[in-house]
Regions:
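Aromatic-rich, lipid-facing transmembrane alpha helices and their immediate juxtamembrane interface loops
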Residues: 1-179
Length: 179
């Protein structure tokens, strides 16, 4: 079990120190990395097909933004604000930014998921789908993201270590923010 920390890092203006007792099962880590890689390959093939078919680079540009902006800019800042931690022994760390480890499964997961969700939303809006259906689609995406985070916390791939109201290990604020 991950210990909850209440102390701050020296000189960090109240930023909570991350846990040092969280470890990842290496085999499970590599399996997750493989699964998100298959998802990325599917997204990449879809991006090429859709870009050629529609002669519109939007899907491909969303894939690039999902691979660059979210994991390397949004994720590290959000991890500090929400007191989120990926263990340093996670297989295949892509980068350490602002003292936060960003595993490749996070980078690849963003690259695989962001373009699909955004492009699907774009297609629904341009097709004139009513707001009720758009909100239902958003709810489905948000719920699936919540379940993925709950599983990641349960299996030790990540931890929320602040003083949060938790739902199956995930802060209520994170579930709302991901919506």
């Amino acid at each position: 079990m991950v210990a909850r920390h209440t102390r701050s890092l020296p000189g960090d203006s109240g930023i909570l120190a991350p846990p040092n007792d969280l470890h990842v099962n290496q085999t499970a880590g590599w399996i997750v990395l493989g699964l998100v890689s298959v998802a990325l390959l599917t997204t990449l093939v879809s991006a090429v097909i859709i870009t050629r078919r529609d002669r519109n680079p939007l899907f491909l540009l969303l894939l690039i933004s999902g691979a660059v902006l979210f994991p390397f800019f949004v994720e590290p800042a959000g991890d500090i604000i929400l007191a989120t931690w990926y263990p340093p022994d996670t297989p295949a760390i892509a980068a350490t930014i602002l003292g936060r480890h960003i595993p490749w499964f996070v980078v690849i997961g963003y690259a695989a998921g962001i373009p699909v969700a955004c492009y699907a939303g774009y297609q629904m809006i341009t097709a004139g789908l009513e707001a009720k259906r758009l909100l239902l689609a958003l709810a489905a995406i948000s719920l699936s993201e919540g379940v993925i985070e709950m599983a990641a916390v349960h299996f030790g791939f990540m931890s929320y270590y602040g003083n949060h109201a938790l739902i199956f290990g995930v802060p209520l604020s994170s579930l709302v923010q991901n919506a």
